[in-house]
Amino acid sequence: ANPDLLRAAAARGVRAAFIAAAGYGEGDGAGRHLQDELVALCDELGMVAAGPNGQGVVSPPVGMCAQIVGPDPPAGHIAVASQSGNLVSSFLNYATQTEVGISRAVSAGNAAMLGVGDYLEWFSTDAETAVGLAYVEGVEDGRRLAGQLRRATAHKPMVLLKGGVSADGQTAAASHTGSLATDDAVFEGMCRQVGVSRAADVEEAFDIAATFATQPLPRGNRVVVLTTAGGWGVMTADAIASSSLELATLPADLYESIDALLPPRWSRNNPVDLAGGETRDTVPQIMELVAAHPETDAVIFLGLGIQSNQARLMRNGPFFPDHGLDRIVDYHERQDRRFAAAAAEASERTRTPILCATELAVADPSNAGPEAVRSTGRLCYPSSHRAVRALDHLWRYARYREQHGLGSLQG
């Protein structure tokens, strides 16, 4: 039926098609022969086809969601291409959960005519897209893919997640999409050479892409950590030490400015433990001071949502809303909303990435803190380790652009 449908579509002026049906190149010799015939027909008709054996295509900016599995994500600036349709769905589900939206998404399937590299290269010139995100299982023409990725990363960041790393994974990939085995060390080297951010798993891949889509690139690798609790700061310092980032030394002028705003028991070092001094104005003021300082390249803010968590306990208690508890709850939630807004505003004014991390992003998504971060269009990270890993990729890509004379990102 597919050849007849393609001919009918071409007769009506259609120049692109998505083929969802399986039974082609991922199967036996007969299926591969059918796939070759399908490609020849598309060439004859002057059409391009995505698939076959794919789940669909999505373009939220124009309201299109044409895929088998149903995630309908918000519009945003992450473009997805994948050799697995269900991985597309995974990324779209994360976009829906985090409210960091999607510009385009396509399941490449068997990639009979168009491979992941073709999509990523097109994404790099798409005005709606800030970052490309892809899942691949195998590479048939490594030299061609490397060229496509090098051209793409000259314009925009590209994030890749690779399946089929182990022998068992390669066997599964061969039966899934007909992908050829790829030496992982060679693939890793290719990613580094062409400036691609390679992720270790689905969560990291989306974190990296969402960070590229919503944060400015850092000017350098010096990070200041602002925290409402010492332990979180210690763990974040460890994570930074394991990355290409550095825990910034507080310059004397910045130290003195912070010291004037916080109680005497503050940590007097980086990480900056606010020591209970997070009042309505001090957090926004310190965030602005730190982000604007020329010796700060990025900020990680920990502890957002604690006050709203206390408010939740009060709201659910037997005495609410009496005894002034309604006013206390409102105050705590407004505090967290103010801190989230201050982080986004300071980041935009200073062009410094400011990442907010709290486990409440997943433990209590309705908490006013994470909810307020989402309302600014940014990602609220479930842990500081995930924030550090994403920020590390931003710095590596910024350094790649600098080393290759690519200039600043446009838009």
Regions found by a protein language model. Name each.
Residues A1-G411:
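Catalytic-core regions of core metabolic enzymes
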